[in-house]
Amino acid sequence: MNLIEFPLLDQTSSNSVISTTPNDLSNWSRLSSLWPLLYGTSCCFIEFASLIGSRFDFDRYGLVPRSSPRQADLILTAGTVTMKMAPSLVRLYEQMPEPKYVIAMGACTITGGMFSTDSYSTVRGVDKLIPVDVYLPGCPPKPEAVIDALTKLRKKISREIVEDRTLSQNKNRCFTTSHKLYVRRSTHTGTYEQELLYQSPSTLDISSETFFKSKSSVPSYKLVN
């Protein structure tokens, strides 16, 4: 049994018969074999690549990198996400089967980093696009920090109920329409223009100056790129 934390065993008899719940058994199997999809766009991904070597050996955590989102249950975003890349990231997230998890690695992924000040094309935080489970700050984070983030994610998985997670994600989902980004009633806050609504493909060429509001932070109700 994995000693990371849960599932809690209800009882153990003298005959070594272990009883538990299907949900705990499912959580234990998932936290012991995470299959990540590596979405690296910048220098933070180089730090994650060092985990593959013999010094850190991330295979001992059951991590099996996948090249297809349909075979992955964890997406690790590392690096800057631009407005043109945003629909592709959301599409990859949609193609992953439930339950699925996200680790945001590095300052550029979490807040936009040094590109968020004057850049017209940088997304100020990947949580504007997809729900994030674990934030991993740093520029770049060390491999030890990546291992710590994976450990925290495994603890979170061990405590959750799959049905509750699926319901909460279905209420605030990101999805693509004709390869365009369209966010419905997001609970996240940001500096995006609130009045930008989805109209037609001919009206989607929105200037970058009107896309962000630097004066006040408002809830992002609808967003189109």
Curated annotation (Swiss-Prot):
It is an enzyme of class 7 (translocase). This is NAD(P)H-quinone oxidoreductase subunit K, chloroplastic. InterPro entries: NADH_UbQ_OxRdtase-like_20kDa, NADH_UQ_OxRdtase_20Kd_su. Keywords: 4Fe-4S, Chloroplast, Iron, Iron-sulfur, Membrane, Metal-binding, NAD, NADP, Plastid, Plastoquinone, Quinone, Thylakoid, Translocase, Transport. One of its GO terms (biological process) is photosynthesis, light reaction. GO terms for molecular function: 4 iron, 4 sulfur cluster binding; iron ion binding; NADH dehydrogenase (ubiquinone) activity; quinone binding. It is a peripheral membrane protein. NCBIfam families: nuoB_fam, PRK06411.1. Pfam families: Oxidored_q6 (PF01058). Its cofactor is [4Fe-4S] cluster. It catalyses: a plastoquinone + NADH + (n+1) H(+)(in) = a plastoquinol + NAD(+) + n H(+)(out); a plastoquinone + NADPH + (n+1) H(+)(in) = a plastoquinol + NADP(+) + n H(+)(out). Its main location: plastid. It is found in: Plastid, Chloroplast thylakoid membrane. It comes from the Eukaryota. Binds 1 [4Fe-4S] cluster. GO terms for cellular component: chloroplast thylakoid membrane; respiratory chain complex I. NDH is composed of at least 16 different subunits, 5 of which are encoded in the nucleus. Its EC number is 7.1.1.-. The gene is ndhK. It comes from Triticum aestivum (Wheat).
